[in-house]
Regions:
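N-terminal carbohydrate-binding accessory modules
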Residues: 26
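Boundary at the C-terminal end of the N-terminal hydrophobic targeting segment
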Residues: 16-23
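Extended ligand-binding groove/face enriched in aromatic
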Residues: 46-229
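Bacterial N-terminal signal peptides
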Residues: 4-16
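Mature N-terminal segment immediately following signal peptide/propeptide cleavage
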Residues: 29-49
Length: 229
């Protein structure tokens, strides 16, 4: 049994929206309390400084993104940290409770911390630092079957699996919500990244800045190819 990031909060948000629509008697307060309790647990106990991976053992002794993760790691690609941020903003809209907006701010600050100098995001980053992340790539990442990009540390950003885009969308929502200037600079940074990395034909590479240093099983490095997912 694993803790699935965001599922309890998402269910609560949906139920809360339904209660507002149908005015069910006596249940709204219970659901709101349960929803807040679950969110507080996810933010205070499950997250690492406001960042998430995908799955956790109930005792939090092990955790996974697309592969097993260190406790200090934060996963970007859905259903990782930006996905939780979107849920928190949805919960804020459903309830009007600033508790959820403040939790979303915490998630946004984590994403800003993990934004690469180029403006985008990798699949994952590590609060323990780049050397810790490189060590993970050299051990856990290299054991990945059919996960070629985890077998090599590029040090650049990815468009694959909505990595950079999911983080960018969430920061855009945070900025539009209250026009908080704290989100303007990182948002402009990722917009510049997106424009700079676009090919003249209109598509975008799997990863950027472009790298060609990881041919795999006799085939050329595909990370500069236009990506479709």
């Amino acid at each position: 049994v694993c803790i699935k990031v965001g599922l309890t909060l998402f269910a609560g948000a949906c139920l809360c929206g339904g209660i507002q629509a149908h005015s069910l008697n006596g249940e709204k307060e219970d659901i709101l309390n349960t929803m807040k309790s679950a969110t507080r647990y996810m933010m205070d106990s499950v997250s690492y400084r406001g960042g998430f991976v995908w799955n956790y053992l109930p005792d939090l002794s092990r955790s996974w993104g697309e592969m097993e993760a260190k406790r200090t790691m934060v996963w970007i690609q859905p259903p990782g940290t930006p996905s939780v941020g979107h849920l928190l903003l949805d919960a804020y809209h459903a309830t009007g409770d600033k508790f959820y907006y403040e939790a979303a701010e915490k998630v946004a600050n984590v994403l800003i911390w993990g934004q690469l100098e180029c403006g985008g995001w990798n699949y994952v980053f590590d609060f323990a630092g780049e050397n810790s992340l490189k060590e993970w790539y050299e051990t856990v990442g290299k054991s990945g079957w059919r996960l070629e990009e985890f077998r090599h540390y590029y040090g650049n950003a990815t468009y694959d699996d909505l990595g950079t885009i999911s983080a960018a969308k969430f920061l855009l929502r945070m900025y539009v919500e209250k026009n908080d200037p704290a989100y303007k600079a990182p948002l402009e940074k990722v917009i510049h990244f997106i424009l700079e990395s676009q090919y003249p034909v209109g598509g975008w590479p799997q990863r950027y800045p472009l790298r060609y240093d990881h041919p795999f099983e006799g085939k050329e490095d595909y990370s500069s190819f236009i990506t479709l997912n």
